[in-house]
Amino acid sequence: VSDPVQLSDEQISDQRLLKGARARATIARHAADVASVEGLTGLSLGRLAGDLGVSKSGVATLFGTKENLQLAAVQSAREVFIDYVARPAFESPKGMPRLRALIANWLSYVDEPVMPGGCFRVAGLAEFDSRPGPVRDALAADRADWFALLEKEIGRAQEQGFVPGRDPHALAFQLDALVSSANTASRMGDESAIPTARAIIDALLGADA
């Protein structure tokens, strides 16, 4: 019988780090799900520990404070949004096709929510728009990144001859407002919200674009 493999201290440390990173990602993802329904202010280390069947001290070791947990939830939700909305759109050509894909993906994300409370971005911004601090800063940075992406593709679309004469920021603002409103209306049971938003977006971008 061969001797058992002896792990070095460095290997043991690496495994612990990997296990810790996986645990942190799992908890952060659940925190984002909970926050999508109950808000980021409703998060607690104890609540998440109970939901996931782990010790509160273990969660505290990974995150330290409620604010760190909130920030991790924001980052996890951002990654989900990128995976479902932004990244697939990058398979489309730059400009109007990609802009269309970004908005279509977001509407699908709203129509068939990945998180139980619908679009985390919409809920989080509404909750923290008047609460200065690191969490608001993280949400604002995410929003700024999203607007920058929309404006970039709007600019490219204009180079292709679409939406001439429109201010890219103003158009991005309109598109964002439409889908955000559709998310809220859809959560309130308005079945016309998504098709209404799609029709208005077609009018803004040009039905044949």
Regions found by a protein language model. Name each.
Residues 72, 86-117, 170-175:
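Hydrophobic alpha-helical connector segments
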Residues 23-26, 30, 34-68, 72:
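Helix-turn-helix
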Residues 1-22, 164-166:
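N-terminal intrinsically disordered/low-complexity leader segments
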Residues 98, 113-134:
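Amphipathic alpha-helical segments used for helix-helix packing
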Residues 109, 156, 175-192, 204-209:
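Amphipathic C-terminal alpha-helical segment
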Residues 20, 168-175, 193-197:
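Short amphipathic alpha-helix in the helical subdomain of ABC transporter nucleotide-binding domains
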Residues 82, 97-101, 133-159, 173:
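Amphipathic alpha-helical packing segments from all-alpha helical-bundle domains
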Residues 76-81:
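Short, basic, alpha-helical segments at the C-terminal edge of helix-turn-helix-like DNA-binding modules
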